Amino acid sequence: MYEEIFNQIRSAANKRNLKDSTIHAYCTSVAHFLNHTAKDIDALTTDDVDIFLTEKKLSGISPETYNHYHSGIRFFYKKILKMNWDDDDIPRMKRDRKLPAVLTKAEISAILDATPNLKHKAMIATMYSGGLRVSEVTHLHYDDISRTNKTIHIRDGKSRSDRYTLLADRTLEILTEYWFQCGRPRGILFPSSWTGDYLTKDSVIQFFRESAERAGIQKHVSTHCLRHSFASHLFESGCDIKYIQALLGHRDPKSTEIYLHVSNKTLLGIKSPFDEMGGE
């Protein structure tokens, strides 16, 4: 019904090197908006957006969902319709800056011990070792692991920029065992056993949840807790926030400062917290 509009959005978004997932989200948001207004494109005004977003807010949706709608419709109005858009008149919804859940080192060890599948264990260890997002660990390739430099190369992450992060000795040991016992993959590091393609995010989230339950973790945890724990444990060891920001791939310092404070160390000699777990 709106295919021509979606094609215009895709074209404009591709020129700006936006990710496919972002483009899909924009099209979905615009489709919801257009279905709600039921107006001809030429008759749309910013008042229509205000009414739509106000109704969404009153329905009790989360700030994240509200802002997804906002971003997609804003892009549509500014880049496709070439209409003025005042962020003061149609603001984004402020999010609660909640402290993220952080796992202790003992809890992470327990989760690893409760993970019988070697591939799953290697993925959990890798996420904690370098603070990886689920989408980043699923898209790792064999060549992204540097045994010499003890680094993990994250390609085309969420911010559309490459970075390097830490590879713990303990993680390398687990990865080596996994590699030799699970087919010695030379392309995708953690391929699906069924398709040979990238694992889905949902499958990783599911097996991590099952491992946490087997480990007896009582708090509500997610795979993202490994990333938060990586950053928090680095900070506790004295690592400067700007280096943690770089390792996480955060462009906005506020994304890191939600759970960290400034310290005084340099990147030289920084160890992954996985290498400092000892007997905890």
What are these regions (language model features)?
Residues M1-E280:
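Conserved catalytic core of the tyrosine transesterase superfamily
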